[in-house]
Design a protein with these regions (language model features):
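Short conserved beta-strand segments at catalytic cores or DNA/RNA-binding microdomains
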Residues: 1-4, 142
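Alpha-helix initiation/capping motif
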Residues: 1, 72-73, 127, 183
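Glycine-rich loop-to-alpha-helix module at the N-terminal edge of alpha/beta enzyme cores
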Residues: 3-99
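Rossmann-like NAD(P) dinucleotide-binding subdomain of oxidoreductase/dehydrogenase enzymes
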Residues: 66, 93-184
Length: 184
């Protein structure tokens, strides 16, 4: 880990071409159902992640960030739980405003703005030093109905993998966010 390179915190399989293709295939398979899910149901997953991180998993996430990214308790708390929970809650709040904001309609005429997800997937190459941003680069697009292929930094894999487990526990369906650790 950054402060002690001889201490092994975890091991992981480095994804190759086959795993990357599997992640892309899984994302595209999940795309239609996830993008057509009502936004309030997608928002409920984000809010469950925020709730799990603010209660049950707060200290585990802090410890993972401290060990994996060599942050002190104060830095870990600000980076991971605090900022990440804010990102998740803000994203759902602002999504509600985006979906509610509609153009003016005259009597007998309906003007309506419809939002749709991207036709492909989001590729997120996340930073080594901010666990909260690693989550946000995946979950903000997911909030809006997109699917993602996530390549975490090799020095942040432990905390990022932990987040992926929390996403799953919160009800994020298979294929919506696809975690592929590897070189680069």
């Amino acid at each position: 880990m950054p402060h002690d390179h001889h201490h092994v915190l975890a091991t992981y399989h480095k994804a190759g071409e086959k795993e990357v293709q599997m992640a892309i295939d899984a994302a595209m398979k999940a795309h239609k159902e996830w993008s057509e899910l009502p936004w309030v149901e997608r928002a409920s997953v984000m809010l469950r992640v925020a709730e799990l991180l603010s209660t049950k998993y707060r200290y585990i996430l802090n410890a993972s960030v401290m060990l994996g990214q060599s942050k002190n308790p104060f830095q870990a708390e600000i980076d991971a739980p605090c900022e990440l929970i804010d990102f998740l809650r803000f994203s759902t709040f602002y999504a509600s405003q985006v979906y509610a904001d509609q153009p003016y309609s005259e009597t007998g005429i309906l003007n309506r703005m419809e939002y749709r997800a991207l036709e492909g997937f989001v590729f997120s190459l996340t930073p080594f030093n901010f666990t909260s941003i690693a989550s946000n680069l995946n979950m903000a697009p997911a909030m809006m109905g997109n699917v993602a292929v996530w390549k975490p930094s090799t020095t942040a894999i432990h905390s990022n993998y932990f987040l992926m487990k929390v996403f799953r526990e919160a009800g994020l369906p298979d294929g919506v966010v696809n975690f592929i650790p590897g070189q680069g």
